[in-house]
C-alpha cells in the first residue's frame, strides 16, 4: 500500500459536512464481495488498509490513532488478449472446417468471441487493484492515494454513496 512505504501521490479533500457516527458500519455495508462472485464486469467495494483481501471492517482493523485506513478495491476477471485471440482463431478454424468455408463472417467472429469469453472467463483469476485512503474524521480531511481524475472520480462516487 502506498501509505505504508515508499513515495506516493495523493489528493487531499476537505469533508464539508459532519461525518455520521456509524461511519465504519456504512463502509462495512459496502464491503468488497467474495472473489468467487467476480465476473468480467468490475466490482467495487471497501476493504481495510491492510491488504486487498481483508473485508472485515471494524474499529480494530480499520482505525489507528483516530484515523480510518481503508481501500476501495476493484476486482474484475479479464482474459489475456493473446489467449482470447488464440481461442478465437482455433474456434474459427473449427467452424470453417465444419461448414466447409473459406472465411468466417464478422458476425460469426463476434459470436465466437463472446462465446469464448463466456466459456473461459470464470477460469481466469480476478485482477485486483485498490485506491487507498486515510480519513481523519476530527479534522474532516480525506487523503486519497490517487492522482488521475478518473480514479478520483470513481473513488469519490463510491465514498459518497
Where in the sequence are the language-model features?
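Primarily extracytoplasmic ectodomains and periplasmic/lumenal surface modules that are beta-strand-rich
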Residues: 20-21, 77-79, 150-152
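Short beta-strand scaffold segments in enzyme catalytic cores
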Residues: 11, 132-135
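Surface-exposed, low-hydrophobicity interaction/linker segments
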Residues: 25-58, 62-132
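Short Lys/Arg-enriched alpha/beta "domain-start" segment
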Residues: 1-41
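Short cationic amphipathic helices and targeting signals
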Residues: 11-13, 68-71, 140-146
Amino acid at each position: 500500500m502506498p501509505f505504508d512505504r515508499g513515495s506516493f501521490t495523493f489528493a487531499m479533500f476537505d469533508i464539508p459536512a459532519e461525518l455520521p457516527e456509524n461511519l465504519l458500519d456504512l463502509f462495512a455495508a459496502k464491503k468488497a464481495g467474495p472473489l468467487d462472485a467476480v465476473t468480467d464486469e468490475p466490482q467495487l467495494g471497501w476493504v481495510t488498509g491492510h491488504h486487498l483481501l481483508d473485508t472485515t471492517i471494524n474499529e480494530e482493523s480499520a482505525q489507528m490513532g483516530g484515523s480510518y485506513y481503508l481501500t476501495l478495491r476493484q476486482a474484475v476477471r479479464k482474459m489475456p488478449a493473446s489467449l482470447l485471440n488464440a481461442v478465437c482463431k482455433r474456434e474459427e478454424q473449427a467452424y470453417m472446417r465444419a461448414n466447409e468455408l473459406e472465411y468466417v463472417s464478422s458476425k460469426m467472429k463476434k459470436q465466437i468471441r463472446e462465446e469464448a469469453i463466456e466459456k473461459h472467463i470464470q477460469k481466469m483469476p480476478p485482477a485486483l487493484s485498490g485506491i487507498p485512503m486515510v480519513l481523519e474524521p476530527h479534522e474532516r480531511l480525506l487523503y486519497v492515494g490517487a492522482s488521475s481524475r478518473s480514479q478520483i472520480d470513481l473513488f469519490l462516487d463510491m465514498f459518497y454513496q
